Amino acid sequence: GAPAAYPIYPSAPPAQQWVQTGPPLASWGDRVLATLIDMLYQLPAIVLYMVGIFVAVINAPTTSTRGVVVNRGNPGLMWLGLALLAIGMLGMMAIGLYNVLALQGKTGQTWGKKRVGIKVIHQETGVILSVGQTFLRQLCHYLDSAVYIGYLWPLWDPMRQTFADKLMKTVVIKIK
């Protein structure tokens, strides 16, 4: 006789959709504006970092292709430049970590998000992420930064989520 037919299984239920019961989702423009505001808070450290690079490079010794020293540079100023670079980098890291982990990890908002009136919440529970979850979400942003497609994702995504939002199951909502 003929082999038995494969059993028929019911189809999978449709993917859970965001039910708009609370505040609207934040626009991509609001998210970009919040990021730019956050960067303004880091501007002094960024300037220090850039000045440090410039001073270090301009005052570094240079050699010819044969290894002959062409310009001895100014070691004192070169080290000053490297110190400024390091201080600027540490400043950017400290400001960024405080803004994202201490503020957003406790309130769902960075300085920029607060100014724009948006907040990060868990997509399913509606609660603010923990500091650890906020750290993981930020790490996902860094992993995606090589191609930046995740940052553009909200432009066509119905949930307006970035790559990191998708992985962490978060949404950014408008609160004012």
Which ranges hold each PLM region?
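Glycine-rich flap/beta-hairpin and adjacent strands of clan AA aspartyl proteases
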Residues: 147-158
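Short, small/hydrophobic-residue-rich motifs at membrane-helix boundaries and re-entrant hairpins
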Residues: 1-146, 162, 166-169, 173-176
